[in-house]
Structure formats: structure tokens, C-alpha cells
Amino acid sequence: MILVIGSEKGGCGKSTLAINLVVMSAREGIDTLLVDADIQGSCNEFSQRRDELAIAPRIQVMMKQGRNLHRELADLQHRYQRIIVDTGGRDSAELRSSLLVAQTVLLPVQPTQLDLWATEKAFQITATAQDLNPSLQTYVVITRAHTNLLVTTARDAMQFLSEFPHVRLCHTILYERLAWQKSILEGRSVVELRDTKAYTEMKLLYEEIFDGGIPQVETDPKP
């Protein structure tokens, strides 16, 4: 399968999500390729860092850009069990091209009004892609949510996003935690650290995306 992770706005943790999903897939023994289609090359840098530290399992990363990305992905999907594509935090040729052959697109969004407005534009892009690729499923996940229970922005964002019928809103919320930054510096995913809350959040999201499951345990916003 091909999973595209995209966004209309940077800073939502898009590359971090791609990295964690590919490491988790590799740890399950799934032959997975991470395609870094973002000119910033963050996923490729992470892969090099992980290789330098000799951390197993090794993840496979290719850098691919351009409006013909869909053709390359169509060829690569016959060689790998799973392909995860990290596109830039904007409306790009790579995002639109990859959606032509993807089965799933995951849109991370921070619970701020500016991010929600940008995500509405992303929904328009995925809806257009579905006209050409009817099997494409659109998921959206709240990221970098505040851990303070008195801050209701995540709940408000969930309510707003639930009003889009062609989009599947993930039940899992990813909260802002130091573990996300620490894991990247160490060349690891959060599931390879001893942060049980970040681990639980990522595990539940993984199950929602790849297993189609609905989490039975709500994530805990407390630090």
C-alpha cells in the first residue's frame, strides 16, 4: 500500500509522523520504503543519523521529487509491502502527484485556527484527487495538542473536523511531548523510548491507519 503524509502548513509534525510510522512498520517485519519527497530532506537526514548510530532495524529511504512522482511510486509499490511518502508542508506537485496512486493520505493538523483553515484547503486537494483515484481514503489527525486539560483547542478542532463527511477523523490525538524531539535526536521512534504516553499515542494511531481499528483506550493528555 501507499500512504501519503501531507499538509498545507508546516510545523504540524508531518515528517516526525512519517519517521515513526516507517520505523514501526520495519519493527513489525514489513518491507517498508520511506519516500522523502520534501525538499528539506528531514526524513533522509534522520535515516543517516539512525545508520550512524547502528540502530536496528535499518529503515529504507529514497529521495524523490517532481510532478511524475506517481509513476515512480506505481513502480515501487511492486517491490515493497508498504510505501510511506513524506511530502512538503504546502500544496506541491509531489503531493498532488502521489495522491493519484495512493490508497491513503494522512493529514496532520495542529489545533489552531490558522492550521484548520489551511487543512480545509488540503481537503479540497484530496477531494479533487478522489475524482481521479476513487479508492483514496483521507485521514486527519490532531497533532501537537496542549497537555493542559483546561485548554479545549484539541476538542474544538475535533468538532470542526468532524463536519467533513469525506474525511476520516482519527480518534487518537498526539500531544506535545518532549519525547517526540528526543527520539529524533537519538535516531529512534517514540516507541523505542521509555515514554509510555507518546508510545501509546503512536501505537493507537498506527492501528487506526493500518489496521482500521478504533482505539478502545483514549490517549491521556497529562505529561
Give each language-model segment a name:
Residues 2-8, 12, 20-89, 93, ...:
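P-loop/Walker-type NTP enzyme "switch/lid" segment
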Residues 45, 92-98, 116-118:
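Conserved ATPase-coupling elements of RecA-like P-loop NTPase cores
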Residues 94-113:
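Inter-motif core of Ras-like GTPase G domains
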